[in-house]
From Swiss-Prot:
InterPro entries: PHBA_efflux_AaeB/fusaric-R, PHBA_efflux_pump_AaeB. GO terms for biological process: carboxylic acid transport. Disulfide bonds: none annotated. Pfam families: FUSC (PF04632). It comes from Yersinia enterocolitica serotype O:8 / biotype 1B (strain NCTC 13174 / 8081). The chain crosses the membrane at residues 11-31, 41-61, 67-87, 91-111, 119-139, 150-170, 368-388, 405-425, 429-449, 460-480, 481-501. GO terms for molecular function: transmembrane transporter activity. Keywords: Cell inner membrane, Cell membrane, Membrane, Transmembrane, Transmembrane helix, Transport. It is found in: Cell inner membrane. This is p-hydroxybenzoic acid efflux pump subunit AaeB.
Length: 651
């Protein structure tokens, strides 16, 4: 029952059932174009499977369904507004729709990746409505309502198929990953105190950052499964912070030991070096370490080690609650209430603008070419351009997504022709035969989708789209060929646009991210208690993960970013003297660091960065004048030296 083959076959059957149910109910309820409900069921069920490379979790399917509903409704409302305002000017209507698609793509590039699908869908939904009702604009409201109804029906069928045939809960995977992350955290600390080779440590913390990010991403899917996981969701949110704290403290321990190898006593090092292959054994180790720290002198225990043990203790307490989903205790409530996460602003503003420009320009060119030539395949081509350019932009490799779509529509032509010209006409007298034939196609492609076969998802969606499943069915070969040709040309044009309009914002975005790490470090210099209690770690590590995705082979950037995160944490824990002059200087330093981020050109950025270094030198002198202890002056000096050393990478 748990073998990979059985799981693949089970999902393929789920996909077939969802598509067949949407087809049957679409005809039974007398919907005008059941194709949309069938296509929605296929995309909602198969999309997460292609992304996961296997059977998706129930929460992923429902999350995808909700995003499709939201995107469809936003797109329908946008299309209706454009039609109402410009009904007497068809060309202006089409150009406004292209602008709408570009704006939606721009927004989808700024929001969280898991929610970007809704805005991409909203962009091309409005275009589909306007293109479809171009000759009868007065019927646009009716078409929008019908499309929304068909979309909702397809989503209901996909969710029901998952519920009926053994839904896959994400909870067990969360439990396993929670334990794995804890074990990996302990191993990372052991590597840092040994110390091991830099490459081994880099690999260990890189994997931990990815697993911690993945664990946090599972929360939304868990909440989509059932409301009874609310307590787990709260614990997971704080567990994410504790895991990031453990990574930071372990890496800071490595840096401290590199400069002061004798700071760790032999007894403490021996205790930390003892193996602990299970969470239960780590729990026992933490008990022993807490007792040892309690009876030891405070100066005998490095601050990073005591902080690591404290974070690991909180992690263990939260992990136990996640496994059992029990009521939140008073101690846990104190931990949960003490975390105030800070949301970060996207650093991909320029990248998002390029994405919106690609979609807007590509759809506008397709629309003008359609209006100029009167090409019968122009509408389908224009819609396909919008679909590909909207959905590909937020992926790590948009060009490969466009190629996937192109291969899919090419494969859909012979498969769709076989069904449209031979199989479907032969099953017109029997709904059962029609459902079996379409279900068989879905079953075969459902297996390939889980293998992430290039072109498989595009083949499924494109084949359903060109079959023109309408009520009543009309077998117009010319219409079929126009639709198929429009899809192929649209995907090809989209690929050409992606290749011609290059995104050169990668280096700029990477530099912006690094300068944001600098800003977070200097902003920790504050006497404001509310600001010091803010939790920046999730936002900082989210930006670090983004840096990992953008520059997968540049280990120097990761080390610099991680060192700046460590500097932020160290300065945030430093007791800065309360002084009006120092507080005013803190504001000035933050302002200068912000100007470095928002500088319009390299000359201004270089000027403000030099000013920031000068202000940090002045700040160090003020700390000396006010006789601040070494615990305050040393971290500030370390940060200033780091910025001097790596200024070429930051400007």
């Amino acid at each position: 029952m748990t073998s990979p083959t059985f799981i693949r076959l089970r999902f393929a059957f789920k996909l077939s059932f969802a598509i067949v149910a949407a087809l049957f109910l679409g005809f039974h309820l007398q919907l005008e174009t059941p194709r949309w409900s069938v296509l929605t069921a296929a995309i909602v069920a198969a999309g997460p499977a292609f992304a996961a490379g296997g059977e998706p979790f129930s929460g992923a399917i429902r999350h995808r369904g909700w995003l499709r509903i939201i995107g469809t409704f936003i797109g329908c409302i946008g299309g209706l507004i454009i039609i109402v305002l410009t009904i007497r000017a068809p060309v202006l209507t089409l150009m406004l729709c292209c602008l709408w698609a570009g704006v939606c793509t721009w927004i989808s590039s700024l929001v969280r990746v898991e929610n970007s699908y809704a805005f991409g869908l909203a962009g091309y939904t409005a275009l589909i409505i306007i293109v479809t009702t171009g000759e009868t604009p007065l019927l646009t409201p009716q078409f929008a309502v019908e499309r929304c109804s068909e979309i909702v029906l397809g989503i209901v069928c996909a969710v029901m198929a998952d519920l009926l045939f053994s839904p896959r809960s994400i909870k067990q995977d969360i439990d396993r990953l929670v334990d794995k992350v804890l074990l990996d955290q302990y191993r990372l600390l052991q590597l840092c105190i040994r110390p091991a080779e830099k490459t081994d440590i880099d690999r260990a913390w890189n994997d931990l950052v990815k697993n911690t990010t993945a664990l946090n991403g599972m929360r939304s899917y868990l909440m989509m499964e059932s409301s009874r996981w609310q307590r787990c969701n709260r614990r997971l949110q704080v567990l994410h912070t504790e895991s990031l704290t453990l990574i930071t403290q372990a890496c800071e321990t490595y840096l401290v030991l590199a400069n002061h190898p004798d700071i760790l006593t032999a007894e403490l090092k021996a205790m930390l070096s003892e193996p602990a292959p299970t969470p239960a054994e780590i729990h026992q180790r933490m008990k022993t370490l807490r007792q040892f720290i309690a009876v030891s002198h405070s100066e005998a225990i490095p601050h990073t080690i005591s902080s690591w043990v404290g974070a690991a203790t909180r992690y263990l307490l939260l992990a136990k609650g996640i496994h059992t989903n029990s009521s939140i205790s008073r101690v846990e409530e104190g931990i949960l209430a003490g975390v105030v996460p800070v949301k970060h602003v996207s650093a991909e503003g320029h990248h998002a603008m390029i994405n919106g420009l690609r979609t807007g320009v590509a759809t506008a060119i397709g629309g003008l070419f359609w209006l100029w030539t009167g090409w019968t395949s122009g509408a389908g081509c224009m819609v396909m351009i919008a679909v590909v350019t909207s959905l590909a932009m937020r992926t790590p490799n948009p060009r490969m997504v466009a190629i996937d779509f192109l291969l899919g529509v090419i494969m859909a032509l012979p498969i769709g022709a076989l069904y449209f010209m031979f199989i479907i006409p032969a099953t017109q007298q029997s709904m059962l035969l029609l459902c079996i034939s379409l279900g068989l196609l879905a079953f075969i492609i459902g297996i390939e989708v889980q293998k992430r076969r290039l072109g498989s998802l595009g083949t499924l969606a494109s084949t359903i789209n060109i079959m023109v499943l309408s009520n009543p069915m009309e077998f117009n070969v010319s219409l079929f060929l126009d639709s198929a040709l429009g899809q192929i040309v649209g995907c090809f044009v989209s690929l050409i646009v992606l290749l011609l309009i290059r995104d050169n914002a990668k280096d700029r975005t990477g530099r912006t991210l690094l300068n944001r790490f600098v800003y977070s470090a200097v902003s920790a210099l504050t006497t404001n208690k509310a600001r010091r209690n803010e939790n920046h770690l999730p936002a900082l590590y989210q930006q670090l993960n983004q840096l990992l995705m953008m520059f997968p082979g540049d280990i120097d950037k990761y080390r610099l970013a991680l060192t700046l995160i460590i500097a932020h944490q160290r300065l945030n824990k430093t007791e800065v003297p309360v002084n009006a002059e120092l507080s005013a200087f803190h504001k000035q330093i933050r302002y200068t660091a912000d100007r470095v981020i928002n500088a319009k050109n390299s000359q201004k950025r270089r000027y403000y960065f030099a000013r920031l270094l000068q202000e940090l030198d002045q700040y160090q002198q003020k700390l000396v004048d006010y006789q601040s202890p070494d615990a305050v002056t040393r971290p500030v000096k370390r940060l200033a030296d780091m910025l001097h050393k790596y200024q070429s990478a930051l400007i």
